Amino acid sequence: LSVSVAGGRHMFNNASMQGDIVIDMRLMRSIDIDAEKRTAWVESGCIVFDVDQEAIAHNLAAVTGQFYDTGIAGFTLGGGLGFLSPRYGLSVDNLLAVQLVSPQGELLYIDDETDPEKMWVARGAGWNLGVVIRMKLKLH
């Protein structure tokens, strides 16, 4: 059986809906902002609108997409070019950590200290590591 993960469902070829089993992340939309550290833990069902609204409420901004209905996980893990990119880089450049379930069913926390090699993979191809549950993003 093939498995795919669906977050925001903003895609051009319906890719997240092509598996025999679809893991629907839409209800996982919690955001936890640490205004002092200028970071946010964002669950993978969030869309750009969710992240922008929470960041703005703390007088902060995240590097997000240009369309509010874009899923933040797919956007970030795939690179993520947004309005703030000329100043702060791609969304993936602002990815600090990921928490995911591996294909073996292990719950993993990955950042530059715990596993720099997997964190390198997460920045651009993170969906290949497993099902990303949440991500830690740098805010500005």
Residue ranges and their predicted role:
Residues 1-6, 12:
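Classical protein tyrosine phosphatase
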Residues 1-3, 25-68, 78-112:
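N-terminal glycine-rich flavin-associated loop
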Residues 11-14, 49-50, 70-73, 139:
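Flexible loop/turn segments at secondary-structure boundaries
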Residues 14-23:
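Glycine-rich loop at the start of a catalytic domain that most often binds anionic cofactors/ligands
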Residues 88, 96-140:
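C-terminal substrate-binding/cap subdomain adjacent to the FAD-binding core in PCMH-type
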